[in-house]
Amino acid sequence: MSNVSLSPSAVSRIMTRVCWLVRQDSRHQRIKLPHLEAVIVGRGPETKITDKKCSRQQVQLKAECNKGYVKVKQVGVNPTSIDSVIIGKDQEMKLQPGQVLHMVNELYPYVIEFEEEAKSPGLKTHRKRKRSGNSDSVERDASQEAKPSTGAEPGSNPSQCSVPPKKEKDAATKKESLSHWSQGLKISMEDPKMQVYKDDQVVVIKDKYPKARYHWLVLPWASISSLKAVTREHLELLRHMHTVGEKVIADFAGSSKLRFRLGYHAIPSMSHVHLHVISQDFDSPCLKNKKHWNSFNTEYFLESQAVIEMVQEAGRVTVRDGMPELLKLPLRCHECQQLLPSIPQLKEHLRKHWPK
Protein backbone atom coordinates (compact mmCIF):
# COMPACT_ATOMS: atom_id res chain seq x y z
CA MET A 1 0.00 0.00 0.00
CA SER A 2 1.42 3.37 -0.99
CA ASN A 3 1.31 6.32 1.35
CA VAL A 4 -0.18 9.53 -0.03
CA SER A 5 0.93 12.71 1.67
CA LEU A 6 -0.97 15.97 1.42
CA SER A 7 0.70 19.33 1.48
CA PRO A 8 -0.05 21.58 4.46
CA SER A 9 -1.82 24.02 2.14
CA ALA A 10 -4.07 21.28 0.76
CA VAL A 11 -4.98 20.18 4.26
CA SER A 12 -5.62 23.66 5.58
CA ARG A 13 -7.72 24.93 2.65
CA ILE A 14 -11.13 23.55 1.81
CA MET A 15 -13.02 24.50 -1.36
CA THR A 16 -16.72 25.16 -0.88
CA ARG A 17 -19.36 26.45 -3.27
CA VAL A 18 -21.43 29.52 -2.44
CA CYS A 19 -24.35 31.21 -4.17
CA TRP A 20 -25.11 34.91 -4.67
CA LEU A 21 -28.27 36.73 -5.72
CA VAL A 22 -27.31 39.54 -8.10
CA ARG A 23 -29.45 42.52 -9.13
CA GLN A 24 -28.91 43.00 -12.88
CA ASP A 25 -28.90 46.77 -12.74
CA SER A 26 -26.41 46.68 -9.84
CA ARG A 27 -28.65 48.84 -7.61
CA HIS A 28 -27.31 47.13 -4.52
CA GLN A 29 -24.65 44.68 -3.41
CA ARG A 30 -25.01 40.98 -3.96
CA ILE A 31 -26.99 38.97 -1.42
CA LYS A 32 -25.38 35.77 -0.18
CA LEU A 33 -27.54 32.65 -0.22
CA PRO A 34 -26.00 30.10 2.17
CA HIS A 35 -26.36 26.44 1.23
CA LEU A 36 -29.81 25.07 2.13
CA GLU A 37 -30.68 28.09 4.29
CA ALA A 38 -34.01 29.84 3.69
CA VAL A 39 -33.44 33.52 2.88
CA ILE A 40 -36.38 35.94 2.67
CA VAL A 41 -36.01 38.76 0.13
CA GLY A 42 -38.39 41.59 -0.72
CA ARG A 43 -39.02 45.30 -0.31
CA GLY A 44 -36.53 46.99 1.99
CA PRO A 45 -33.12 48.63 2.38
CA GLU A 46 -31.21 45.51 1.40
CA THR A 47 -32.77 45.41 -2.10
CA LYS A 48 -33.55 49.15 -2.28
CA ILE A 49 -36.99 48.20 -3.59
CA THR A 50 -39.62 50.71 -2.40
CA ASP A 51 -42.48 49.55 -4.62
CA LYS A 52 -45.43 48.76 -2.31
CA LYS A 53 -46.54 46.02 -4.72
CA CYS A 54 -43.47 44.11 -3.63
CA SER A 55 -43.97 42.54 -0.21
CA ARG A 56 -41.28 42.82 2.45
CA GLN A 57 -41.37 39.03 2.31
CA GLN A 58 -41.83 38.56 -1.44
CA VAL A 59 -39.77 35.41 -1.98
CA GLN A 60 -38.07 32.69 -0.01
CA LEU A 61 -34.80 31.52 -1.57
CA LYS A 62 -33.00 28.29 -0.73
CA ALA A 63 -29.72 27.61 -2.53
CA GLU A 64 -28.79 24.07 -3.53
CA CYS A 65 -25.12 24.92 -3.97
CA ASN A 66 -24.03 21.37 -4.74
CA LYS A 67 -26.71 20.99 -7.41
CA GLY A 68 -26.31 24.43 -8.94
CA TYR A 69 -29.76 25.96 -8.54
CA VAL A 70 -31.94 27.93 -6.11
CA LYS A 71 -35.45 27.00 -5.02
CA VAL A 72 -37.67 30.10 -5.21
CA LYS A 73 -40.96 30.21 -3.31
CA GLN A 74 -43.33 33.12 -3.95
CA VAL A 75 -44.51 34.35 -0.55
CA GLY A 76 -45.96 37.72 -1.55
CA VAL A 77 -49.36 38.17 -3.20
CA ASN A 78 -48.21 39.87 -6.41
CA PRO A 79 -46.54 37.69 -9.05
CA THR A 80 -42.89 36.71 -8.96
CA SER A 81 -41.63 35.15 -12.18
CA ILE A 82 -38.70 33.21 -13.61
CA ASP A 83 -38.11 33.90 -17.30
CA SER A 84 -41.60 35.46 -17.37
CA VAL A 85 -43.22 32.29 -16.01
CA ILE A 86 -45.17 33.24 -12.89
CA ILE A 87 -44.41 31.07 -9.87
CA GLY A 88 -47.72 31.59 -8.06
CA LYS A 89 -48.55 32.30 -4.41
CA ASP A 90 -46.99 29.70 -2.11
CA GLN A 91 -45.67 27.81 -5.14
CA GLU A 92 -42.04 26.94 -5.80
CA MET A 93 -39.80 26.84 -8.87
CA LYS A 94 -36.11 26.27 -9.55
CA LEU A 95 -33.94 29.21 -10.58
CA GLN A 96 -30.88 28.14 -12.53
CA PRO A 97 -27.86 30.10 -13.78
CA GLY A 98 -28.83 31.91 -16.96
CA GLN A 99 -32.45 32.46 -15.90
CA VAL A 100 -33.86 35.80 -14.76
CA LEU A 101 -35.92 36.18 -11.60
CA HIS A 102 -38.23 39.21 -11.62
CA MET A 103 -39.08 40.00 -8.02
CA VAL A 104 -42.60 41.29 -8.75
CA ASN A 105 -44.71 42.25 -11.77
CA GLU A 106 -41.86 41.67 -14.26
CA LEU A 107 -39.76 44.26 -12.37
CA TYR A 108 -36.48 44.15 -10.42
CA PRO A 109 -34.51 41.49 -12.32
CA TYR A 110 -32.11 39.18 -10.52
CA VAL A 111 -29.81 36.34 -11.50
CA ILE A 112 -27.78 33.88 -9.46
CA GLU A 113 -24.10 33.08 -9.62
CA PHE A 114 -22.03 30.41 -7.96
CA GLU A 115 -18.46 30.76 -6.71
CA GLU A 116 -15.81 28.46 -5.34
CA GLU A 117 -14.47 29.64 -1.99
CA ALA A 118 -11.25 28.39 -0.45
CA LYS A 119 -11.62 28.38 3.32
CA SER A 120 -8.61 28.18 5.60
CA PRO A 121 -9.40 27.37 9.26
CA GLY A 122 -9.12 30.56 11.29
CA LEU A 123 -8.20 32.62 8.25
CA LYS A 124 -10.03 34.86 5.84
CA THR A 125 -11.98 33.17 3.05
CA HIS A 126 -10.37 33.22 -0.39
CA ARG A 127 -12.74 33.47 -3.35
CA LYS A 128 -12.10 31.83 -6.65
CA ARG A 129 -14.33 33.41 -9.22
CA LYS A 130 -14.30 33.74 -12.97
CA ARG A 131 -15.02 37.16 -14.38
CA SER A 132 -15.49 38.65 -17.81
CA GLY A 133 -14.52 42.27 -18.32
CA ASN A 134 -15.65 44.43 -15.41
CA SER A 135 -19.01 42.75 -14.89
CA ASP A 136 -19.96 41.31 -11.51
CA SER A 137 -23.14 39.67 -12.74
CA VAL A 138 -23.68 36.40 -14.52
CA GLU A 139 -24.07 35.84 -18.19
CA ARG A 140 -27.47 34.63 -19.16
CA ASP A 141 -25.74 32.26 -21.58
CA ALA A 142 -27.42 33.75 -24.60
CA SER A 143 -30.59 33.54 -22.60
CA GLN A 144 -32.32 30.37 -21.64
CA GLU A 145 -33.48 30.02 -25.20
CA ALA A 146 -30.37 30.66 -27.25
CA LYS A 147 -27.91 27.76 -27.11
CA PRO A 148 -28.17 25.43 -30.12
CA SER A 149 -29.33 21.85 -30.05
CA THR A 150 -26.98 19.17 -31.30
CA GLY A 151 -29.35 16.23 -31.74
CA ALA A 152 -29.72 13.96 -34.74
CA GLU A 153 -32.65 15.94 -36.08
CA PRO A 154 -32.18 19.59 -37.16
CA GLY A 155 -33.65 21.97 -34.62
CA SER A 156 -34.29 19.26 -32.10
CA ASN A 157 -32.40 17.70 -29.23
CA PRO A 158 -34.74 16.51 -26.48
CA SER A 159 -31.87 14.93 -24.56
CA GLN A 160 -30.51 18.35 -23.67
CA CYS A 161 -33.43 18.80 -21.29
CA SER A 162 -32.39 15.78 -19.22
CA VAL A 163 -29.92 16.01 -16.35
CA PRO A 164 -26.36 16.05 -17.71
CA PRO A 165 -23.41 14.30 -16.06
CA LYS A 166 -22.21 16.21 -13.02
CA LYS A 167 -18.92 17.30 -14.59
CA GLU A 168 -20.69 18.73 -17.62
CA LYS A 169 -23.25 20.44 -15.42
CA ASP A 170 -20.54 22.03 -13.27
CA ALA A 171 -18.71 23.19 -16.37
CA ALA A 172 -21.89 24.68 -17.77
CA THR A 173 -22.57 26.47 -14.49
CA LYS A 174 -19.11 28.01 -14.52
CA LYS A 175 -19.50 29.03 -18.15
CA GLU A 176 -22.80 30.73 -17.39
CA SER A 177 -21.13 32.92 -14.77
CA LEU A 178 -18.55 34.41 -17.11
CA SER A 179 -20.21 37.73 -17.79
CA HIS A 180 -23.39 39.76 -17.50
CA TRP A 181 -26.38 38.01 -19.07
CA SER A 182 -27.28 41.01 -21.23
CA GLN A 183 -24.09 40.40 -23.18
CA GLY A 184 -24.81 36.69 -23.54
CA LEU A 185 -27.38 36.92 -26.30
CA LYS A 186 -25.09 39.01 -28.46
CA ILE A 187 -22.28 36.54 -27.89
CA SER A 188 -24.48 33.64 -28.98
CA MET A 189 -25.79 35.48 -32.01
CA GLU A 190 -22.23 35.98 -33.21
CA ASP A 191 -21.09 32.43 -32.45
CA PRO A 192 -20.92 30.44 -35.73
CA LYS A 193 -21.56 27.20 -33.82
CA MET A 194 -24.95 28.50 -32.74
CA GLN A 195 -26.09 29.90 -36.05
CA VAL A 196 -28.50 28.12 -38.36
CA TYR A 197 -28.80 31.01 -40.81
CA LYS A 198 -27.63 34.60 -41.01
CA ASP A 199 -27.69 37.58 -43.34
CA ASP A 200 -27.01 41.29 -42.94
CA GLN A 201 -30.25 41.86 -40.98
CA VAL A 202 -30.93 38.76 -38.87
CA VAL A 203 -29.49 35.58 -37.44
CA VAL A 204 -31.29 32.33 -36.62
CA ILE A 205 -30.22 30.15 -33.69
CA LYS A 206 -31.68 27.03 -32.12
CA ASP A 207 -33.62 27.35 -28.89
CA LYS A 208 -31.59 26.06 -25.95
CA TYR A 209 -34.65 24.37 -24.46
CA PRO A 210 -36.81 23.52 -27.50
CA LYS A 211 -40.48 23.01 -26.73
CA ALA A 212 -41.01 20.96 -29.91
CA ARG A 213 -39.03 18.89 -32.42
CA TYR A 214 -38.18 22.09 -34.27
CA HIS A 215 -37.77 25.35 -32.38
CA TRP A 216 -35.68 28.27 -33.65
CA LEU A 217 -35.28 31.93 -32.75
CA VAL A 218 -34.95 34.65 -35.39
CA LEU A 219 -33.12 37.68 -33.99
CA PRO A 220 -32.28 41.03 -35.61
CA TRP A 221 -28.71 42.28 -35.49
CA ALA A 222 -30.14 45.70 -34.64
CA SER A 223 -30.53 46.33 -30.92
CA ILE A 224 -34.28 46.29 -30.22
CA SER A 225 -35.04 45.63 -26.57
CA SER A 226 -38.61 44.32 -26.89
CA LEU A 227 -41.83 44.55 -28.85
CA LYS A 228 -42.59 47.73 -26.92
CA ALA A 229 -39.70 49.40 -28.74
CA VAL A 230 -40.95 48.42 -32.20
CA THR A 231 -42.24 51.22 -34.48
CA ARG A 232 -43.24 51.56 -38.13
CA GLU A 233 -39.56 52.01 -38.91
CA HIS A 234 -39.12 48.33 -38.10
CA LEU A 235 -41.86 47.06 -40.42
CA GLU A 236 -39.53 45.83 -43.15
CA LEU A 237 -37.36 44.13 -40.54
CA LEU A 238 -40.37 42.34 -39.04
CA ARG A 239 -41.42 41.18 -42.49
CA HIS A 240 -37.89 40.00 -43.20
CA MET A 241 -37.75 38.09 -39.90
CA HIS A 242 -40.98 36.33 -40.87
CA THR A 243 -39.66 35.49 -44.33
CA VAL A 244 -36.43 34.11 -42.88
CA GLY A 245 -38.42 32.01 -40.42
CA GLU A 246 -40.33 30.46 -43.31
CA LYS A 247 -37.05 29.88 -45.15
CA VAL A 248 -35.56 28.00 -42.20
CA ILE A 249 -38.66 25.79 -42.05
CA ALA A 250 -38.30 25.01 -45.75
CA ASP A 251 -34.57 24.37 -45.49
CA PHE A 252 -34.52 22.22 -42.36
CA ALA A 253 -38.02 20.75 -42.12
CA GLY A 254 -39.16 20.82 -45.72
CA SER A 255 -39.76 17.09 -45.83
CA SER A 256 -41.68 17.17 -42.56
CA LYS A 257 -45.46 17.14 -42.51
CA LEU A 258 -45.49 19.11 -39.28
CA ARG A 259 -47.35 22.39 -39.01
CA PHE A 260 -45.45 25.47 -37.81
CA ARG A 261 -46.28 28.76 -36.14
CA LEU A 262 -44.23 31.94 -36.08
CA GLY A 263 -44.74 34.45 -33.29
CA TYR A 264 -43.62 36.38 -30.24
CA HIS A 265 -44.28 35.98 -26.54
CA ALA A 266 -46.36 38.85 -25.17
CA ILE A 267 -43.94 39.14 -22.25
CA PRO A 268 -40.58 37.88 -23.51
CA SER A 269 -37.88 36.33 -21.36
CA MET A 270 -35.01 38.15 -23.08
CA SER A 271 -34.27 41.81 -23.57
CA HIS A 272 -33.86 41.46 -27.34
CA VAL A 273 -36.69 41.00 -29.84
CA HIS A 274 -36.87 37.38 -31.00
CA LEU A 275 -39.30 35.55 -33.25
CA HIS A 276 -40.16 31.96 -32.29
CA VAL A 277 -40.40 29.46 -35.14
CA ILE A 278 -41.88 26.31 -33.62
CA SER A 279 -43.40 23.08 -34.91
CA GLN A 280 -46.79 22.16 -33.52
CA ASP A 281 -45.99 18.63 -32.38
CA PHE A 282 -44.68 19.89 -29.00
CA ASP A 283 -42.75 16.64 -28.75
CA SER A 284 -39.99 17.60 -26.33
CA PRO A 285 -39.02 16.76 -22.75
CA CYS A 286 -38.32 20.47 -22.29
CA LEU A 287 -42.07 21.07 -22.33
CA LYS A 288 -42.59 20.45 -18.63
CA ASN A 289 -45.46 22.47 -17.23
CA LYS A 290 -48.67 24.39 -17.83
CA LYS A 291 -46.86 27.69 -18.22
CA HIS A 292 -44.66 26.29 -20.98
CA TRP A 293 -47.71 25.02 -22.83
CA ASN A 294 -49.85 28.11 -22.44
CA SER A 295 -47.05 30.44 -23.51
CA PHE A 296 -47.37 28.94 -27.00
CA ASN A 297 -51.04 27.97 -27.09
CA THR A 298 -52.99 30.96 -25.83
CA GLU A 299 -53.15 34.63 -26.81
CA TYR A 300 -49.88 34.96 -24.90
CA PHE A 301 -48.30 33.88 -28.19
CA LEU A 302 -48.65 36.73 -30.69
CA GLU A 303 -48.74 35.60 -34.32
CA SER A 304 -45.98 37.14 -36.41
CA GLN A 305 -48.35 38.37 -39.11
CA ALA A 306 -50.68 39.87 -36.49
CA VAL A 307 -47.75 41.80 -35.00
CA ILE A 308 -46.79 43.09 -38.44
CA GLU A 309 -50.37 44.23 -39.11
CA MET A 310 -50.58 45.89 -35.68
CA VAL A 311 -47.42 47.89 -36.29
CA GLN A 312 -48.55 48.80 -39.79
CA GLU A 313 -51.90 50.12 -38.55
CA ALA A 314 -51.09 51.54 -35.11
CA GLY A 315 -47.37 52.15 -35.35
CA ARG A 316 -46.65 50.03 -32.29
CA VAL A 317 -47.40 46.72 -30.57
CA THR A 318 -50.06 46.81 -27.88
CA VAL A 319 -50.19 43.99 -25.35
CA ARG A 320 -53.42 43.80 -23.40
CA ASP A 321 -53.53 43.58 -19.62
CA GLY A 322 -53.78 40.25 -17.87
CA MET A 323 -51.39 38.35 -20.12
CA PRO A 324 -49.65 36.55 -17.22
CA GLU A 325 -53.00 35.09 -16.19
CA LEU A 326 -53.17 33.22 -19.50
CA LEU A 327 -50.28 31.07 -18.34
CA LYS A 328 -52.51 29.67 -15.58
CA LEU A 329 -55.30 28.48 -17.89
CA PRO A 330 -56.24 24.77 -17.93
CA LEU A 331 -54.38 22.54 -20.36
CA ARG A 332 -56.27 22.41 -23.64
CA CYS A 333 -55.25 20.58 -26.81
CA HIS A 334 -54.44 23.11 -29.54
CA GLU A 335 -55.79 20.78 -32.22
CA CYS A 336 -59.13 19.51 -30.89
CA GLN A 337 -59.62 21.75 -27.81
CA GLN A 338 -59.97 18.79 -25.44
CA LEU A 339 -59.11 19.57 -21.82
CA LEU A 340 -56.37 17.43 -20.26
CA PRO A 341 -55.60 17.21 -16.52
CA SER A 342 -51.81 16.99 -16.68
CA ILE A 343 -48.80 17.49 -18.94
CA PRO A 344 -48.07 13.73 -19.25
CA GLN A 345 -51.66 13.09 -20.31
CA LEU A 346 -51.56 16.05 -22.70
CA LYS A 347 -48.38 14.73 -24.30
CA GLU A 348 -49.88 11.29 -24.71
CA HIS A 349 -52.99 12.85 -26.26
CA LEU A 350 -50.93 14.96 -28.68
CA ARG A 351 -49.51 11.82 -30.27
CA LYS A 352 -52.91 11.27 -31.87
CA HIS A 353 -52.49 14.48 -33.84
CA TRP A 354 -48.98 13.86 -35.15
CA PRO A 355 -48.74 13.43 -38.92
CA LYS A 356 -48.62 9.79 -40.00
Swiss-Prot record:
Gene designation: APTX
Q: Where are the zinc fingers (C2H2-type)?
A: 331-353
User: Where do the record's region annotations for Interactions with ADPRT/PARP1 and NCL lie?
Assistant: 1-110
Residues flagged as site, Interaction with DNA substrate:
188, 265, 276, 291
Origin organism of this chain?
Sus scrofa
**SUPFAM superfamilies hit by this protein:** HIT-like, SMAD/FHA domain
- What name does this protein carry? Aprataxin
Domain HIT positions: 182-287
Where does it live in the cell? Nucleus, Nucleoplasm; Nucleus, Nucleolus
What are its E.C. numbers? 3.6.1.71, 3.6.1.72
- Gene Ontology CC annotations of this record: nucleolus; nucleoplasm; nucleus
Q: What does the record note on quaternary structure?
A: Interacts with single-strand break repair proteins XRCC1, XRCC4, ADPRT/PARP1 and p53/TP53. Interacts with NCL. Interacts (via FHA-like domain) with MDC1 (phosphorylated).
Into which EC class is this enzyme placed? hydrolase
Residue ranges for the region (Interaction with DNA substrate) are 207-211, 269-270
Q: Where is the FHA-like domain?
A: 38-87
Name the Pfam families for this protein: DcpS_C, FHA_2, zf-C2HE
Keyword line: DNA damage, DNA repair, DNA-binding, Hydrolase, Metal-binding, Nucleus, Phosphoprotein, Zinc, Zinc-finger
Which residues does the Swiss-Prot or TrEMBL record annotate as the active site? 274 (tele-amp-histidine intermediate)
